[in-house]
């Protein structure tokens, strides 16, 4: 039987294939999440910054109310945004996000970026992103909150024997480099369960992957299709690389296995125990994505795909104005 989940260092099982709700329109999120669960998805990956947590929770609750799944069958992820890194604000936002989803607890809560911005209350401006106004007339100042402070706040919310009412099951990070994780590792009482990173054949990051595996930190890959995830955002680097779906290497492997390019890209990750969270608005593609664990690539095929690595990163705050350097 194909492997469909991995065990986190927190003791919980995490599905290898999830449904990501980044860029899912708010008015379509509830139905999209419901449809994904009905098709067999058991992990939903969200974030406060995606602005659709309320609607995602509605889709989850509908699936539970209709008897499709039980709450304990699902693995729900959300993320702490940059304006809420101080201890009291991290706790405030984690509780807010749990309440917004309306499903009792979150299975995984991540620090979205190793970036601490000046606090902006949710009541003043929901979803402030990197700017304190929708016109983007000025950037939000950095706050320089130590990551250890933020982490300690999240630790206080984790369900444990001594904290049975904790609203988080596991905690982790996203977009963290090895050195920052090393610093966090030294002070953390609860070790990060997951690091969610940009990972695709054009950005393999083998040294970071090795570090995470050595430390027992699970890996979730976002933007598994590389440039495809950023076409609608008019990202300047998209036009400088071959779309992965049409790349000769990917096409040849897909044709050999009778699979789609998307399935090959997802299997390249999941076969190495890397969790994937693709998004699709198409039911057939949702089914295909979920089915990516039902075949295996050869070691040579995995290497061929990995050899496409050219260090191209699409999600980089250094591209902002002003730039924020977290990967240099």
Curated annotation (Swiss-Prot):
Assigned keywords, A-Z: Carbohydrate metabolism, NAD, NADP, Oxidoreductase
Induction: Overexpressed during growth on both D-xylose or L-arabinose compared to D-glucose. Significantly expressed during late stages of infection of barley leaves.
A Pfam family matched in the record: Aldo_ket_red
Superkingdom: Eukaryota
Signal peptide interval: none
Chain residues that bind substrate: 112
Active site: 50
Residues noted as binding NAD(+) in the record, renumbered to the chain: 174-175, 223-232, 279-289
InterPro entries reported in the protein's UniProt record: AKR, NADP_OxRdtase_dom, NADP_OxRdtase_dom_sf
SUPFAM superfamilies in the record: NAD(P)-linked oxidoreductase
One of the record's GO molecular function terms: aldo-keto reductase (NADPH) activity
Keyword Coiled coil tagged: no
Site (Lowers pKa of active site Tyr): 79
Class of this enzyme: oxidoreductase
EC number: 1.1.1.-
Similarity comment text for this entry: Belongs to the aldo/keto reductase family.
Function: Pentose reductase with a broad substrate affinity involved in pentose catabolism. Has highest reductase activities with L-arabinose and D-xylose as substrates, and displays much lower activities with D-ribose, D-galactose and D-glucose. Has highest dehydrogenase activity with L-arabitol as substrate, followed by xylitol and D-sorbitol. May be responsible for the first step of the L-arabinose catabolic pathway.
Identification of the protein by name: NAD(P)H-dependent pentose reductase
The organism of origin for this protein: Pyricularia oryzae (strain 70-15 / ATCC MYA-4617 / FGSC 8958)
């Amino acid at each position: 039987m194909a492997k469909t989940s991995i065990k986190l260092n927190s003791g919980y099982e995490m599905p290898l294939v999830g449904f990501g709700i980044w860029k899912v329109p708010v008015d379509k999120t509830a139905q999209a999440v419901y449809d994904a669960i009905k098709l067999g998805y058991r992990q939903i990956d969200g974030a406060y910054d995606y602005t659709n947590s309320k609607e995602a929770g509605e889709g989850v609750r509908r699936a539970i109310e209709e008897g499709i799944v039980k709450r304990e069958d699902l693995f729900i992820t959300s993320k702490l945004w940059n304006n809420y890194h101080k201890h009291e604000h991290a706790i405030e936002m984690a509780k807010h996000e749990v309440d917004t989803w309306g499903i009792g607890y979150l299975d995984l809560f991540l620090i979205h970026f190793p970036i601490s911005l000046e606090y902006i209350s949710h009541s003043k401006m929901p979803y402030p992103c990197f700017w304190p106004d929708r016109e983007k007339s000025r950037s939000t100042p950095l706050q320089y909150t130590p990551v250890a402070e933020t982490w300690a706040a999240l630790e206080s919310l984790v369900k444990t024997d001594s904290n049975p009412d904790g609203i988080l099951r596991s905690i982790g990070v996203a977009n963290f480099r090895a050195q920052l994780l090393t610093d966090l590792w030294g002070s953390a009482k609860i070790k990060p369960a997951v690091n969610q990173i940009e990972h695709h054949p054009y950005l393999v990051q083998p040294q970071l992957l090795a570090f995470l595996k050595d430390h027992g930190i699970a890996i979730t890959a976002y933007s598994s299709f590389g440039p495809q995830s950023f076409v609608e955002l008019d990202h300047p680097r998209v036009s400088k690389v071959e779309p992965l779906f049409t790349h000769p290497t990917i096409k040849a492997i897909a044709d050999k296995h009778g699979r789609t390019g998307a399935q090959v890209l997802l299997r390249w990750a999941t076969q190495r125990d890397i969790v994937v969270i693709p998004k699709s608005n198409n039911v057939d593609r949702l089914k295909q994505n979920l089915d990516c664990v039902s075949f295996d690539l050869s070691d040579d095929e995995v290497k061929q795909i990995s050899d496409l690595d050219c260090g191209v990163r699409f999600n980089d705050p250094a591209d902002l104005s002003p730039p924020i350097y977290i990967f240099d």
